[in-house]
Structure formats: C-alpha cells, structure tokens
C-alpha cells in the first residue's frame, strides 16, 4: 500500500474491463448473501469468504486453520486465505455480464457524452439502448445510412429487401459498443475542426461541444467503448454490511439488494442464451439487465426508482456520494474525533483570559492515556494494566497526577455553529468541581455564547506539534482582534461596562468634594474609610520622575478614575505627555462606555501587543464586575418615569391628524398623501416623546446608565418602556397608521397588544428562514475561495487599483486613511501641493503613514490589491497587505480565502438574526439585505433593473403622450436612445453629462452589463461597493480585502472567442493564468494568439469551475462533476484545502505548507540550513 503522504496529484479516469478484472479477487456468481442457519457467507455469493477474505481474524471458513501462526496459508478445503478480517474492507470482486450494458452516467448526463461522441440525440440513443429500435452499424452496399434507426417493421422490410447478410444492424448496448469502438478520434477531431471554421450559430455550439468530448478522450487515453461495461465491479463487503438485529432479523445496505437484482438477471440471461431462447425473450432480459445496472449505479436517474420495503427508493452507488449525508460531506470532510467531550457552559469570572474550567471527571477521561503513562513513570502503578484499573476506579492518587498532566496541555473549546475561526479557541484547562465547563466572560462575544443552556465541545490536541499550534496560534489571549475588520472582539460587555461607567461618573456635592490629597494611595485609603465618595471631585498631588528629576503637579479627578486607571497602562496616547499642562493627568479621564473601551483596547494592542492587552482586559473585567455590584445598578418600575409632556404632545398630534383628515375629506389631498402625512406626524411625535423622556432622565437613573454606557438596551427600547411604542408594521410590511400610544410602563390595551404581535411573529419566522440561507451562502463562499492561500512574497505585478473615500450623499462613510491602512502602494505617492514624495512604490502603509497621506488632501491613491495579484495559485503578501487579525503584515501560508468567506458569511447570520431584537418596531428591515448579497455574489440579473447608458455623453429627454425616451448624445454626435418604461423614476436630468455605465433610471444594475461596458475592473468595483453598502446599512464593518478575494475568484475565468494557433477551443472557459501561459507558448514560436473575454461567474458556478474535481464534487452536482472529470482524465493538483482534507493529507496552509514541512535541522552542515530558515522568516 502506498503511503498517504507521498503523492502530489490524483487522477480520475474511466476503468477498462481489464482493469476491473485486475482489481477483482474473484467473480460473484450467486445472489446469495449468508446462510440463514449457520449465518456464514455462502460460497461464490456476495459475501463469499474465498473472494473477500475471512470474517474472523486468522480463521478460515471451515475452521481447519485457526490462530495467527497460519498467517497467509490458503485453506485446501474451503479455499479461504488465513488473514485479518480487515481485508474485507479493501478486496473487490466483479460480475461478468452476459451482455454489455451502457453506463448511465455517460448516457444520461447533461450533455449526454455518448450522444455527443456518436452525434446522436439522447432520445435516439435511449431507443437503441432499451431495445426499442435497431441501429444500422454497417450499411455495406445497401441504401441505408450508418447510424440510421429502424423500428421492428422497418428492420424486417430491410431484411426482406436486401437479405439479412447484406447489412449489419443491432440493438442494445452491444450495437452502441461496436459503434463506439469504430470511432477514430484523431480523424473525428480533424473533421470537426474543419467544420468549425465554416459553421455559425447553434450548429457551431454543438460542434464545439462534440469537439470538447472528442478532445478529452484523445488527451486522457480513455477509450470511448469503455462507456459501455462488460464487467461490473463489486465493492468490498464491509462497505455494504449486513448486520443481525435483535430478534434474528437482518439489516442490510441497499447496495446488496441492487447487486442481487443484477446477478439474478445476469444468471437468467446466461441460461436463456445457453438454451437458445427466442430473440424477443432474450431481448427483454437484456433490457431488464440494463435497467438493473442503471439502478445500481444511479437509481432514479431514468424511469421510476427501484423501491425497497415501504416504497422507499433504494440508495445506489451515486447516492452514497451525493448530498449532505453522502460520503464526501459526511465522512471525508467531517469526521467524528476521539478525545473529545461536551457539556453545558457556565460563566467563570475568576478565570484569566487564557483559562477555561474543565470538569474533573471529564478531564480524567480525556487525559486518561496521559495519566496512565504518568502513573507508571512515577512508579505509582507497576504496569499499564494496573494504571488503567486505578484510573477507572478513580483512586485518590489519580487526581494529583491529573493536575500535573494538565499543567501545560492546552485544550480546544468549540461552540456550534462555528461561523468564523474564533468559534474554536485554545485554553489552559483548570480543574473544576461539578459537571459544567467554565468559560471566560470576555470570549463569549467571539463564540456568540450565552449561559442560558448553551453547550460546548472540548477537544484535546495530542501531538506536540498540535499542542504548540494551539498554544501559539489559537490561545484565546492572542485572538483579541476580529479577522473581518481588525476591531477588538473581546470588548467587555454588560456588567463590566456598567461597572466601569459607574466608576468614571462624577457627582456634584458628593461627600469629600474639593478635598486635597497628597497621593493616590491616600485617596484610596480615604475612600475605604468612607471619608470620600467614589464620585467626589477632588484634587490630588502627582509626583513623577521626568528626565531624571522629580516633578509634581496637582490634578482634578475622582476616586473612581484613580481606581479605574490602575487597570490601564498610562502610555496609550490619550494624553499628550509632552504638554506641561497635561503631563500629570490620568490616561483615562473621560466617561467609559462600550465604545471608548473598544478604543482603549485598540490603542493598547497596537502599543503593547496581545499579552499585555489580555492582562489589561482581565483587570478591567475584575474592576467592572466589582463596581457594578457595589453600584448595585438595577431596574425597578419606578425608574421608568413617564414625562408629563407626553400627553400634551399626543393631544397636539391628534389635532394635526384631524386637520389632515379634514383636508382629505374636502378633496384637497389624495389618499396616499394623507397616509404619508399621518405616518410622518406620528413618527415625529414618537421621536419628540422619546427626546423629552431622555432629557428628563437623571444621569444616575439606572435605565439611562445601562443604555448610555452601551451595557444593554438602546434609546429605542427606553422609548418603548417609558415613552410610547409608536407605529407598528402589519404582516404585509405596511405601516399601520394607528400608533401604540402607551408605553410598557403604562401597559398596552388589547388592540395595541394585538397589533404588536405581528412584528414579533414576523421576526421569529424570518430568523428561522434566514439562518439557513445565510449558512448556505457561507458554504458557497468557502467553496469558491478555499484554495486562496498566501503563497509568495511578491508576485511582481505593476498593476493596482485606485481607492478614494466612500461617500453616500454628502456624508463620508469610509475615510481614505481607513482604506489605505495595511496596504502597499502600487506607485509613488506625491504631495498634491508641494510635490514631495510621501511614499515610494511598494511601501507598506501603517495607520500613521495612511493618516499622513490622507491629511495632505490627496483624492485617490493607487494601491496593490488582490484583484490585480499575479500569483497563479493564491495571492502574494504585498497584494494582500495586513493580516486583520493581528495588525501585522500577513504571513506566507495564511488561508486568506477561508478567512474572507467566514468574514462575509458570519455577519450574514447575524444580520438575519437581528430582525427580532426590536420586537417588530417599524424600521428598515434587511429584506434587501441577505437576498441582495446573494444576488450580487451569484451575479444574477437583479430585480428592478436600472437602465444603463452604454456611452458617455449628454442627456436629452423627450416626453410624448405614450412614452418617455432618453437620448444620450456622444461627443462625436452619435445618438443612443433608451425607452423608459412606465413607472420608472429617472435618475438623470435634461442636459447633464453622464459617463459610460451610469444609471439612467433608478434600480439595481445587472453586473454583466457593467462588465460589458466598463470592463472587468468596473464590474469588480461595482460588486465590491454594492455588497459593502448592504453590510454598512446594518452597521457591519468588513474589510475590502475579504470581498476582493471572493470577487477575484468570480472573475478568474476567460471564455475563448478566437482559437488562433493554440490548443484552446472557442467557447471553452479556462483559467486566466492557463490562458496567458498557452498564449506565451504560442508566441514563443511566432504563432497567432488566442482571443478571449473575462467572464463573470456566480460563486456557485465559480466553485464548480475549479481545477480540483475533488473540491467541486464535494460541493454540488457530484455526479455531473465526476462524469466530466472521468472523461477528461482530470488530474487534481491538490493545491486547495478541501482536496487535501478529503484524501487525509495535511492541508497546504499554515504549518502544513511544503515550505515549512520540509524543514530539517542538520547539525553537520548547519550553516546552509540556517540560511533557508532565515529566508523563510523574512
């Protein structure tokens, strides 16, 4: 058996009959499975021991040879080889068919490969294969045509007319096999190429398709006649097991039934042929054999599926591979693993950031082998057996050993659904009593976990390498930033925020206000002795050593600020230490909210790195919890004070609405206008009530504190608690014009409550539906971008893209500095006024340089981008730039494709889950959200299409009674006219200038139109900005580079239009880099280059168009992908992640890259080795 790690590629092809016989250990001749009395396999049956190997280890069928000492002997009585029973998982057999049978994949697939190569329609082919028509194989001298179909009557007439010997006709797979074997591929290909030059239209398309199939057979070495099978392989018996249930009945795999039908019909056909039965009977039997083989290979593809008991269709070989429950997705891409456990999680506020609490009994079971080894090493137990007994009986010595074993062995915690890479993190386990896993409160955001009964799984990394990776790459304390946008993900929440907020408030007239203190320690002492209130404004003398001399100053602060600042490094840059007036100030002297905590973490991470940040976070956590307990901020009904002004506002609104109604009744305004105005008035009133409420709340009001600090709740929720609920939407999404006047504090009446239920129910239904949609979107994104890995330092491209700040209307939504941070320049950047060089080409822009460039007022900058990267596989570090999760330059081996897919998919689920939080208050629901993102990534024609101008020019609008027409006049005077359909709103005005690709009417643009007008760059830019718009509306930040990775994968294929002297066929889609390489090859000997256009593929299509057939087959349309790959004899280069997971190799990313794996440390010639290592680290 070959080693699983030493091959570089995998090829798939058609199996010839010889090859199938070569795999086989014998022929299955009988349909019997096992003997019902002895329960032993029948000889020559589907489970025969002589063919497949013994059922029990080292024991033959008849029992003459038992025990391992007879290893390898073939029993002379029963013919069974004495060996391990595991061989029954790998030994195959075969069935010799009495008549050839066509393989349904090649006959029935779309397009029918058999039909193409024979130039017959699938319907004609079906008639021949299923014995409804004869086909002329050799017309000889007669006037019949080759491949002409004859029905029964015509065949008889021809026989009478010409005599039976004067021509050859046949039916069934035999005839087709003869025709296939007669095909001369070289000649057919040459003829088709000639025809191609003359033909056009539909005929040309058909010829190209045929040529493709012929060329595939030519290049792959497959023979066309192998699409018809003479001999059928039988898969090993342990892969289609038969097991005895309680009560003596048997459960068996469906495949056994399907094989039995094939064998029965085959044996019957053999008998009929030996007897010389009449033609019509033999023909019927052959047809039945063909159908049985079809059902075995792909049940239900043609006609009605074969059903088992209870009318359930049987699972055929194809079904074993397909879908979520098939071999690919169920067993190859997702396996269950040993050394794992799961339990409910509870909060562990006393833990450090890198720790998790592991229940004692679970830890003992997970680390059992380690504990046993240690027990023997320490001499507590004499051998492994007694050690095992000690562990199983849980003797007291075991616990001490467990403590030692666990000491520096990280474990992985995972919470389903794992939407992004932060859904699995490593922790240092701490043994805890009880049966629940303890989780650090700060990592809950990353896991999206709460403690209402969530469960989590624990996994133990076994090997030293796995432990090292867990400790250095996956430890929770190191994963503070979100890979999607580089913002901190461990921002303290809820109580921690509330405690910090409470601590940093100040109060006029508090006890001890205005006192002077000599030092911070004195303040703390006074606070502990209750001499001074935590919110009192006091003065403190601060002494510091500056440039070797002691200086002191007096600052105004509160005890709370002093306590809070003990957690925070005092050099984060919030205070300008150069300025003598600010020199002694505390680093944090502003009110702490969730937002400002995020900023503090950001600055600390950039300045001090992850370790110090995690220590700071733990300090903030402890302080926050402590002071939110001391502050005892809680909610009572008396805290919701309904402002008296509310009733005046309502009265005023009622009067206005009455006026609007009167105007409507007098016919001064239309129904629509009345509705609009009423809605507008009530919205305005609700807002006014909310504002009045917020202004009337005391700053120490607990509800206000919770919302203002960002701990929990929002203005909208406070408005509903103590203001008024306002307008609601009906199930259709239309706003009901009667508002809910009451707040929850006052209580809703029956009608108001009923109206409220619409939104709540809609929210729940939406959530359930959209979660599935979002998960599927993520899966497609992962599949399309999974092979994008950083593979090299610099691809050497000269290209880039221009970026500028993004505006929506007059408001800047993303500044230039944000877009430049962490990217490389693609050309020299000069100051727009002075002309000085700000950054040379290929300079990395950190936040400081990016700020500096943006501040000069420069409009746009050309940067290196994933779009223009020239790496054939993956991307290079310079085109990618900064790793968002670490804020450092990206490393070679980083799986940026998967990270991109997760970054786009993960908020998708959240967008969809966020609809129900407002309880159905009328607002912008994200209907245009998820479906819009999907529509863009699938490059579909959008709903509500806008009309786009194909050229740049000046607009002229003409309106007649019947229609409106927009004319665009170019500079050269050409006119292009566009008819505007009724009800469309124009985006352009008469006489203005517009560019090519600009919208004339409102609506979404078809990305394919942009592609044809503005080219590939325009289309990429459009997709990027449109997807960003949707996410931004939801307040989700995703870095551009993630979208760039996916969009690049959508625009990688070229459709060949002109062949030139290349080997590329027109109409074929090919990877951009292969296209370039082929053109360069032709150019080298002066030939004519091929022409082609870049095509925009949706993510599903792009994922199926990948070079790897394993990856595509495990994604969707498994049978179609495999059929195609087998005919072409495709070679899978195993460059992506999925392919390698499927065949069980290490993935070629991270430490699994060949570059890192081939490192060896040689002590003899160490200087050479160190050179290679240095080169890798740079």
From Swiss-Prot:
Disulfide bond sites: none
Record field: catalytic activity: RNA(n) + a ribonucleoside 5'-triphosphate = RNA(n+1) + diphosphate
Broad enzyme group: transferase
Coiled coil: none
Name of the protein: DNA-directed RNA polymerase subunit beta'
Complex formation: The RNAP catalytic core consists of 2 alpha, 1 beta, 1 beta' and 1 omega subunit. When a sigma factor is associated with the core the holoenzyme is formed, which can initiate transcription.
A GO term from the CC aspect: DNA-directed RNA polymerase complex
One Pfam short name: RNA_pol_Rpb1_4
UniProt KW keywords: DNA-directed RNA polymerase, Magnesium, Metal-binding, Nucleotidyltransferase, Transcription, Transferase, Zinc
EC number in record: 2.7.7.6
Reported function: DNA-dependent RNA polymerase catalyzes the transcription of DNA into RNA using the four ribonucleoside triphosphates as substrates.
Co-factor requirement: Mg(2+); Zn(2+)
Details of cofactor binding: Binds 1 Mg(2+) ion per subunit.
A GO term, aspect molecular function: magnesium ion binding
Residues that coordinate or bind Mg(2+): 450, 452, 454
Positions bound to Zn(2+) 1: 60, 62, 75, 78
């Amino acid at each position: 058996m070959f080693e699983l790690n030493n091959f570089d590629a995998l090829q798939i092809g058609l199996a010839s009959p010889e090859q199938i016989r070569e795999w086989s250990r014998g022929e299955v001749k009988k349909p019997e499975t096992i003997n019902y009395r002895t329960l032993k396999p029948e000889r020559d049956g589907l489970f025969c021991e002589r063919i497949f190997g013994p059922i029990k280890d080292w024991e033959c069928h008849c029992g003459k040879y038992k025990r391992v000492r007879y290893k390898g002997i073939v029993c002379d009585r029963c013919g069974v080889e004495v060996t391990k029973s595991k061989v029954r998982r790998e030994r195959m057999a075969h069935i010799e068919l009495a008549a050839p049978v066509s393989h349904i994949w090649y006959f029935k697939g779309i397009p029918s490969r058999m039909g193409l190569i024979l130039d017959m329609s699938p319907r004609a082919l079906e008639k021949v294969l299923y014995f409804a028509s004869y086909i002329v194989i050799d017309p000889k001298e007669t006037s019949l045509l080759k491949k002409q179909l004859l029905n029964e009557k015509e065949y008889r007439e021809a026989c009478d007319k010409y005599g039976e010997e004067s021509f050859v006709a046949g039916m069934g797979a035999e005839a087709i096999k003869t025709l296939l074997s007669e095909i001369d591929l070289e000649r057919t290909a040459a003829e088709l190429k000639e025809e191609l030059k003359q033909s056009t239209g539909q005929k040309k398309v058909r010829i190209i398709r045929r040529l493709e199939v012929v060329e595939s057979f030519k290049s792959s070495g497959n023979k066309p006649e192998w699409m018809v099978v003479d001999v059928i392989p039988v898969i090993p018996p342990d892969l289609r097991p038969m097991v005895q249930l309680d009560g003596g009945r048997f459960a068996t795999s469906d495949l056994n039934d399907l094989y039995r039908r094939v064998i029965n019909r085959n044996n019957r056909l053999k008998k009929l042929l030996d007897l010389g039965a009449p033609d019509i009977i033999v023909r019927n039997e052959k047809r039945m054999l063909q159908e049985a083989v079809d059902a075995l290979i792909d049940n239900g593809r043609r006609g009605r599926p074969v059903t088992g008991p209870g009318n359930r269709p049987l699972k055929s070989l194809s079904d074993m591979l397909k879908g979520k429950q098939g071999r690919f997705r169920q067993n190859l891409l997702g396996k269950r693993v040993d050394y794992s456990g799961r339990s409910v999680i509870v909060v562990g506020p006393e833990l450090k950031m890198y720790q998790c609490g592991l229940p004692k009994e679970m830890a003992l079971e997970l680390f059992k082998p380690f504990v046993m080894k240690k027990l023997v090493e320490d001499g507590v137990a004499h051998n492994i057996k007694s050690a095992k007994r000690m562990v199983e009986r849980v003797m007291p010595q075991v616990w001490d050993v467990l403590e030692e074993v666990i000491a520096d062995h990280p474990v992985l915690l995972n919470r389903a659904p794992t939407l992004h890479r932060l859904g699995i993190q490593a922790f240092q386990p701490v043994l805890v009593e009880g049966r629940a896993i303890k989780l650090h409160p700060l990592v809950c955001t990353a896991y999206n976990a709460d403690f209402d009964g969530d469960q989590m799984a624990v996994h133990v990394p076994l090997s030293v390498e796995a432990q090292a990776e867990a400790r250095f790459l996956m430890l929770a304390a190191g994963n503070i930033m979100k890979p999607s946008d580089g913002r901190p993900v461990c921002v303290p929440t809820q109580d921690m925020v509330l405690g910090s907020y409470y601590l940093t408030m100040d109060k006029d007239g508090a006890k001890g206000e205005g006192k002077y203190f000599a030092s911070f320690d004195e303040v703390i002492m006074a606070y502990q002795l209750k001499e001074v209130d935590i919110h009192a404004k006091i003065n403190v003398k601060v002494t510091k050593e500056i440039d070797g001399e002691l200086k002191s100053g007096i600052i105004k602060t509160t005890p709370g600020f002093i306590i809070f600042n003990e957690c925070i490094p005092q050099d984060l840059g919030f205070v300008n230490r150069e300025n003598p007036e600010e020199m002694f100030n505390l680093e944090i002297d502003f009110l702490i909210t969730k937002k400002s905590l995020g900023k503090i973490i950001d600055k600390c991470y950039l300045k001090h790195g992850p370790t110090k940040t995690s220590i700071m976070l733990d300090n903030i956590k402890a302080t926050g919890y402590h002071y939110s307990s001391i502050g005892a901020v809680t909610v009572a009904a008396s805290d919701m004070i309904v402002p008296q002004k509310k009733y005046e506002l309502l009265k005023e609104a009622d009067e206005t609405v009455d006026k609007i109604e009167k105007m409507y009744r007098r016919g001064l305004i239309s129904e629509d206008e009345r509705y609009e105005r009423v809605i507008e008035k009530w919205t305005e009133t609700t807002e006014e009530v909310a504002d009045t409420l917020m202004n009337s709340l005391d700053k120490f009001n607990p509800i206000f504190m919770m919302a203002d600090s960002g701990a929990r709740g929002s203005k909208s929720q406070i408005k509903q608690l103590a203001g008024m609920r306002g307008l609601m939407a009906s199930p259709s999404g239309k706003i009901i014009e009667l508002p809910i006047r009451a707040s929850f504090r006052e209580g809703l009446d029956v009608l108001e409550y009923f109206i409220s239920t619409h939104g709540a129910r809609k929210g729940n239904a939406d959530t359930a539906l959209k979660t599935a949609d979002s998960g599927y979107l993520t899966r497609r994104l992962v599949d399309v971008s999974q092979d994008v890995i950083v593979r090299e330092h610099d691809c050497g491209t000269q290209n880039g893209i221009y970026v500028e700040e993004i505006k929506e209307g007059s408001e800047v939504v993303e500044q230039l500095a944000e877009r430049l941070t962490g990217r490389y320049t693609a050309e020299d950047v000069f100051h727009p006024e002075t002309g000085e060089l700000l950054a040379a080409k290929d300079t990395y822009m950190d936040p400081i340089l990016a700020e500096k460039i943006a501040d000069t007022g420069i409009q746009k900058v050309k940067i290196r981008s994933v779009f223009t990267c020239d790496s054939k596989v993956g991307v290079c570090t310079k085109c990618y730039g900064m790793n968002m999760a670490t804020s450092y330059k990206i490393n070679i081996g980083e799986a940026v494709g998967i990270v991109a897919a997760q970054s786009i998919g993960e908020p998708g689920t959240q967008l969809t889950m966020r609809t129900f939080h407002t309880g159905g208050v009328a607002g912008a629901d994200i209907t245009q959200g998820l479906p819009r993102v999907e529509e863009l990534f699938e490059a579909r024609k959008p709903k509500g299409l806008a009309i786009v101008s194909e050229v740049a020019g000046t607009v002229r609008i003409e309106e007649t009674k019947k229609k409106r027409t927009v004319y665009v006049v170019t500079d050269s005077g050409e006119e292009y006219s566009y008819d505007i359909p009724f009800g469309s709103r124009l985006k352009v005005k008469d006489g203005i200038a517009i560019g090519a690709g600009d919208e004339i009417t409102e609506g979404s643009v078809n990305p394919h139109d942009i592609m044809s007008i503005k080219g590939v760059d325009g289309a990429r830019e459009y997709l990027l900005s449109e997807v960003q718009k949707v996410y931004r509306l939801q307040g989700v930040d995703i870095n551009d580079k993630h979208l760039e990775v996916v969009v690049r994968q959508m625009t990688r294929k070229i459709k060949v239009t002109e062949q030139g002297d290349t080997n590329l066929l027109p109409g074929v889609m090919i990877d951009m880099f292969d296209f370039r390489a082929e053109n360069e090859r032709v150019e080298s000997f002066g030939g004519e280059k091929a022409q082609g256009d870049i095509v925009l593929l949706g993510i599903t299509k792009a994922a199926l168009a990948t070079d790897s057939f394993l990856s595509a087959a495990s994604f969707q349309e498994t049978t179609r992908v495999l059929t195609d790959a087998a005919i072409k004899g495709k070679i899978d280069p195993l460059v992506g992640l999925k392919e390698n997971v499927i065949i069980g190799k290490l993935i070629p990313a991270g430490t699994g890259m060949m570059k890192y794996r081939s490192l060896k440390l040689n002590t003899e010639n160490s200087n050479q080795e160190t050179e290679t290592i240095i080169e890798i680290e740079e």
